[in-house]
Amino acid sequence: MVRHADTPTDAQRAREQFLSTGALQPDAVASSVLNSWQRSRELHVHPDRVELPYVRDPDTDTPLMHAAAPVLRRMAEDLSDQSVSVVLTSADGLVLDRVAADTEFERVLDDVRLARGYSYAEEFAGTNGIGTALETGRPAFIRGSEHYVGTLGGLACAGSPIREPVTRRILGVIDLTCRARQADPLLFVLAKSAGSQIEDRLRTMNNETETALLDAYLKQSRRYPGGVLAIGGDVVLMNRYLRQALDAADQTVLLDHAAELTRSSFTSTTVAHLPSGASVKISAAERIIVGVRSDSVVFHVSVHVAESIPVRSSQHIPRLAGQSSSFRRSAQQVERCYRDREWVVIEGERGSGRTYLGYSVVHFVTPERSIPVLHIDNFDTPESFVAAFESETDSADFAVIVSDVDELPDEVLNPMAAIMQTRAGRGWIAATTSTERDSQLVDLLMLPFFTHTVTVPALRHRIEDLQELVPMILNELSRGEARMDGEAMRQLAKLPWPGNIAQLRHVLTETVRRQRSGVIGVDKLPAECRSVTRRKLTPLEAMERDAIVRSLLENDGNKADAAAALGMSRATIYRKIKDFGIA
């Protein structure tokens, strides 16, 4: 039985005593309330003012929203003659929906920002039915002065966590809020009942989705002779062809790429290079739609096993660092193409080292040769770029690298294609392109001249290569006078590296500016190494992130002091720390 202060006056006196002394007599309030007050105090929540951030627009297209919608409507109808609001939040306390029949009471809730898009997590709102339920993982009933923030003292709220039926992970909270003077234990019972109803609906929806996914998987398995892979929530289905063709490491990388496609609304096909040296083309064959969601997908997977090539040591091409089999396989394939004078497309993400790979291979095989690298940005006009390409490919045994052909302006594609047609069968051209290219003209006019495509893996897919890449780049930047300690290397290995090796070089350049010699610790890494977000920040966001990280370091990690030093509110710094993935 949850114990509360016997009267509103008791709770008010207890709160005032806690705020003035930081301590309370035993049993002055329920232990769950006291623990929450202590957390709120440590989080520097203002005890007298509501300082809630507008976090983001709620995502209404989620399983939680679809499962909760009819429950919220039914409860709102049942309570239509009462001043009670039904509130649904996400797992981070963001208010997703609010339903209330009493318009006057809705204005009261607006005044304290218990509204869509605002967060009622404890770190912002202190002790309350939503945030405390999320923090403890248990239902919470907070009445009147049991709220840490005095402005909320006129309310009572009963919150019950909503859990994913299979994993039991908290998805959000269902909360019933009324005026404190109208608080009734029945509110607590209703909130828990509503939470159970929503979980039941989630379970039913999961069953429907899983059944639909299984049906689609079986249908595609009958129709498609190659690999079939299905992903939906926590369910992964893989046919025998893939289980036999790919080992555990290959399957892990395949699932990583397929999961990215599942989340993407812009592309439905990708090519992945696997640790074994095989490559796979992954294509979305069928998206499963239950309700209005389509986060379950069945893929066709075609596996291309590389021809047997003896695995050489990592010193085979001295300029290249990396022990991962996927990267070494890429290097060996480019080398073979160069030795056989077969034109090759080297594709990969920006900054992954595509041009450098081609250049290093040529330098290794023919060290006496100087190979030109042509990039449109290095020329004043498109015409001068085309002229340089024509000149560099004029000899009988030419070799040239054209960087970022997917960025070439349309007006150079036809003349480039005409030149390549006259050069076919002699010399060697390597063209680099992005795996995310969106240029139909390049695909139509340029790529048909190339007989091979080699994919350079993203740095996050060969993170073990940091053990060679970091010392190599550091040695170059510091002339052999600096090295990373173990903690710094572990922090680098945690990062997603959306900018790949180019980003790594930038990070190490900034690091060497701070410490030019000796053993470099984690504290010398630049601010971006504290951010684990996979998206690439805009220049302005990167500046904000760096300023926040510096302030946190200068204030020993105290978020409130860091916010004050930056002249921003505590709510703002919490939101930006989360947005930027600052660890």
Curated annotation (Swiss-Prot):
One of its GO terms (biological process) is regulation of DNA-templated transcription. It comes from the Bacteria. Disruption phenotype: Cells lacking this gene are unable to express the mimABCD operon. InterPro entries: GAF-like_dom_sf (IPR029016), Homeodomain-like_sf (IPR009057), HTH_Fis (IPR002197), P-loop_NTPase (IPR027417), Sigma_54_int (IPR002078). ATP binds at residues 349-356, 395-404. PROSITE patterns: SIGMA54_INTERACT_4. Residues 320-513 form the Sigma-54 factor interaction domain. It holds the Pfam family HTH_8. PANTHER family: SIGMA FACTOR, TRANSCRIPTIONAL REGULATORY PROTEIN. This is Propane 2-monooxygenase operon transcriptional activator MimR.
